Amino acid sequence: GANWDDFVAFTVELGLEGVEGLSGIPGTVGASVVQNIGAYGQEVATSVESVEVWDRDTKTTRDLTPADLRFGYRYSALKTSMYAGPGRPAGRFFPTPRYVVLSVTFALTHSAEGTVGYGQLAKALGVEVGDRMATADIRKAVLAVRAAKGMLEDPTRYALPDMATAKREANILTDLERLASLNEAAGIPVGDDGLPAPDYNRHSCGSFFMNPILTADQAAALPEDAPKFDATLPD
């Protein structure tokens, strides 16, 4: 499938708002809707209009709406189709979903500005949560924050045979130059060619942790300064 960050970069170049906060996440557009990826105040679910899939059970194509997909916190109906029940793999399709994602239709806003929706990102930009900023600046800040935490994908991995054609060549070069600049600013040496050395700790397929989900009573028992976020759970 299409490289996710290639897609995000393309939307920012076109002056579209909606997924700029999801910059730098490894993986594909198809996988993004299976996991309902989210970061820095945005989730894929808020921008998806429909998903075209191949149903491996009925051998037909289907167009799934957000209601069909039942998006939740790192959750979708596509993801749960791998299971016959809680903790019970569906023998026929596991460890892959019943549905193969063929295409995703996004509904984005024609705007060169986006909303800063996360505290850490707002701090990096020197603004308040809820402020409007250029989507290009939001993307740049997200990538810098990820790099500082060691969570920015190593673009040198695309030189490996198994990764060939997985990302646009022009974007690989842009990513290499960006990471070299960020490394240099952080005092991390770059190669004689001015590009970053391979960092195998950044050969990532993304993070799979989830924040704990608590009842309102359980959350009330936490210290007052413990971060808390409302969660929308699937039925």
Segments predicted by a language model, with ranges:
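Phosphate/pyrophosphate- and phosphate-bearing ligand-binding catalytic cores of soluble enzymes
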Residues: 61-235
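Anion-binding (especially nucleotide phosphate/pyrophosphate-binding) glycine-rich loop
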Residues: 1-58, 62, 68
